[in-house]
């Protein structure tokens, strides 16, 4: 069945009648015994569906159950991006070792072959990614599954867009071993800011250390491309300025990365200018909080207007809420901010100015 699939794929490969591929096969004695089969395949131009490549070159051999691709290169006919691959497959040990470097449109190629989207539909590449990837895989009996897999590499790309929001470039280093992954030196650039940091996933636990100065629209666009249902601001909150966000800590995805999702410990720092809450405008807002399991500890929430400010500290421990509130805003603004949480009795007339300090549980 697998051979039939391979032959089916090969049958789709076309070339011009005037420039057919050239194949040279050499048979020789192998020093270890048996026969060594060498193959040299060259093609000026090949086409597979929508994929068109030129300068195709493959040089390899087979001996003692080992397939060796010494040189495997090609260029994309439209972008001139290249692919360079070296590969060794040991059929006895069921191992595969590879090293690939590419500036070709690999994502478009893969979609053309498997007919499936490999990146969120909200993301569009405006330039081709550059990829370097090496790795080793050990397969189970009959090559039915992978027993061990490790890979490492780096990737970068120029301009791309998410939900129409244009980014300048992105890059990172990455590695993977049997379900555990590491993404380091993550750097995403936007005309209005950047997103940088590292993410590590080990045994169902994801450790995060990221810093963002991306504009709000760009940040929400990235989040929506990953989790569209969750990435939205509360209706009462409007952010017109560009925020700065720092997140450090860990979350648990469960054994086998199958959930349930749970926050272990996260530290969050955020600041923003020109923000509205319940229609009340603030010049700036800053917050610092820590999430531990289901509890939340807010060590700073500072909302600043030209005519006053609000400070809040508090903790939510699952069932208990402890807080301290200080404000010199006009009482009518506090009533607006409270929304449905609090209403002033009709017979009570609010003063024009007041200083408020509240501590409660």
How would you label these PLM feature ranges?
Residues 186, 299-301:
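Tandem-repeat architecture and repeat-register "anchor" residues
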Residues 71:
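Nucleotide-sugar donor-binding loop of glycosyltransferases
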């Amino acid at each position: 069945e697998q051979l039939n699939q391979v032959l089916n794929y090969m049958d789709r490969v076309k070339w011009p009648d005037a420039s057919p591929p050239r194949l040279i096969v050499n048979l020789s004695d192998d020093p270890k015994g048996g026969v060594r089969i060498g193959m040299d395949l060259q093609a000026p131009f090949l086409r597979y569906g929508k994929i068109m490549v030129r300068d195709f070159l493959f040089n390899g051999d087979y001996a003692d159950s080992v397939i060796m691709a010494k040189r495997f290169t090609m260029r994309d006919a439209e972008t001139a991006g290249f692919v360079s691959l070296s590969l060794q497959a040991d059929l006895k040990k069921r191992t595969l070792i590879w090293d690939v470097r590419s500036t070709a449109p690999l994502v478009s190629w893969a979609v053309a072959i498997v007919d499936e989207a490999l990146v969120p539909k909200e993301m569009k590449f405006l330039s081709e990614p550059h990829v370097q990837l090496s790795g080793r895989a050990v397969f189970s009996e009959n090559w039915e599954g992978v027993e061990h897999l490790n890979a490492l590499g780096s990737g970068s790309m120029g301009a791309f867009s998410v939900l129409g929001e244009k980014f300048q470039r992105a890059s990172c280093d990455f590695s993977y071993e049997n379900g555990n992954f590491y993404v380091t030196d993550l750097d995403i650039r936007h005309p209005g800011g950047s997103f940088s940091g590292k993410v590590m996933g080990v045994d169902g636990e994801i450790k995060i250390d990221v810093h963002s100065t991306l504009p709000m629209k760009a940040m929400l666009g990235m989040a929506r491309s990953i989790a569209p249902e969750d990435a939205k601001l509360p209706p009462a909150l409007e952010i017109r300025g560009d925020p700065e966000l720092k997140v450090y800590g860990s979350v648990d995805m469960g054994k086998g990365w199958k959930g349930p999702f749970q926050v272990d410990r996260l530290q969050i720092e955020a600041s923003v200018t020109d923000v509205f809450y319940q229609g009340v405008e603030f010049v700036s807002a800053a917050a610092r909080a820590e999430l531990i399991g289901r509890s939340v500890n807010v060590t700073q929430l500072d909302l600043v207007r030209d005519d006053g400010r609000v400070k809040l500290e508090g903790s939510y421990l699952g069932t208990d809420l402890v807080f301290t509130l200080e404000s010199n805003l006009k009482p009518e603004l506090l009533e607006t901010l409270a929304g449905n949480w609090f209403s002033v009795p009709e017979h009570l007339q609010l003063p024009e100015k007041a200083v408020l300090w509240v501590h409660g549980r």
